[in-house]
Amino acid sequence: MHTRAIYPGTFDPITNGHVDLIERAAKLFKHVTIGIAANPSKQPRFTLEERVELVNRVTAHLDNVDVVGFSGLLVDFAKEQKASVLVRGLRAVSDFEYEFQLANMNRRLSPDLESVFLTPAEENSFISSTLVKEVALHGGDVSQFVHPEVAAALAAKLTSINT
């Protein structure tokens, strides 16, 4: 029985689509660790510490979820966390090929680590952190795509960058 899962990502920022998947994963597994990747190649707007804090605030209502920042190989992080399942989201068919390659690589590196794919609710299927940042950068209202605390943090971040 798989009791511990990891939902990895950059979460820059966490969106309603992410939260939807986290809430559903929390119903499927005894414990879910949200692994926030340092991933310097993505040049995130928020620091790792800021992303961990935002995700902690947005998921505080889930007793069986914790949030941990990490760097390095995901399979190593999964071993450290004693997780046997990776949860990944698929928004569209276009996500599948990349996720399929990742799942196969992770299986090769760690044969006991299973990948489970969840699809978001229809109203969240088009939301991505990249699109949210783009809308916010151009002054658009992102409140329907992210938690209010995330919207405020994003507005503050963009204000500090533009001043």
Curated annotation (Swiss-Prot):
Cofactor(s) the protein requires to work: Mg(2+)
Places the protein is found: Cytoplasm
One Pfam family hit: CTP_transf_like
Residues at which ATP binds: T10, F11, H18, G89, L90, R91, E99, N124, S125, F126, I127, S128, S129, T130
EC number(s) per entry: 2.7.7.3
Keywords: ATP-binding, Coenzyme A biosynthesis, Cytoplasm, Magnesium, Nucleotide-binding, Nucleotidyltransferase, Transferase
Annotated family: Belongs to the bacterial CoaD family.
Stated name of the protein: Phosphopantetheine adenylyltransferase
Protein species of origin: Shewanella putrefaciens (strain CN-32 / ATCC BAA-453)
Gene name tied to this protein: coaD
